[in-house]
C-alpha cells in the first residue's frame, strides 16, 4: 500500500494529466499507472521535452501560432501571398491546410474559440492581436476558417461583425465540411474544396 506522501505524489500526477484534452480522472489514472509501471524512461523523455518546449516555443509575432524564434516558417516565407489571410482556430488547422495544399496566403491563429457554456467569450480569440496583425495594410481578403460547430459558428459570427466596417473582402469556408466537424479531422480533399468554394460574406472596400 502506498504511503500517504507517495499517494500525494501519485495524485499530483493524475491531477496534472487531467489538464490534457478529453482526459478525465479515470483516463488520467490509467495513464499514470502505465507511465510508472511500463514507461519510466519514456516519461523522463516526456518531462525533458516538455521543459524544453516551455523554454523555447513561443507565439509567432505575426500569426500567433507556436514557433521557435520571432517568426514561424510560413510568415517568414516571402513567396507566400500576403494579400489573403486565413483565420483559424488552432495551430493544427494550419498544418491541415498546408497538407491540403489549398492556400498559399498567410494565417492568423486565434488560439481559442467562443464557448459561452465554458465562459469563453470574445476575449478567448485574440482579436486585439488580430487587429495588430492587420495594421500592415497588405491584407485584402480575410478567409474565416472556423469549424461548423456551435463554437466555430459563434466565432465566425463575431469575426464577421469585427470585419463589417473594415475595408476587407471577407469569406468563409463552404459547408462541404460536415456539420459539427472540426477541421482537424477533415480530409485534405474536402478541406481544399471548402477553401476553393468559400462563401463570400462581404466585398472589400470601405
From Swiss-Prot:
Functional summary from the UniProt entry: May play a role in DNA repair. It seems to be involved in an RecBC-independent recombinational process of DNA repair. It may act with RecF and RecO.
Protein name: Recombination protein RecR
Any one GO molecular function term: DNA binding
Classification via NCBIfam families: recR (TIGR00615)
Database matches in InterPro entries: DNA_Rcmb_RecR (IPR000093), Rcmb_RecR (IPR023627), Rcmb_RecR_Znf (IPR015967), TOPRIM_dom (IPR006171), TOPRIM_RecR (IPR034137)
Zinc finger (C4-type): 60-75
Start and end residues of each Toprim domain: 83-178
Family of the protein in this entry: Belongs to the RecR family.
UniProt xrefs under SUPFAM superfamilies: Recombination protein RecR
One of the GO biological process terms: double-strand break repair
Superkingdom, natural source: Bacteria
Short name of any one Pfam family annotated for the protein: Toprim_4
Organism whose genome encodes this protein: Neisseria meningitidis serogroup B (strain ATCC BAA-335 / MC58)
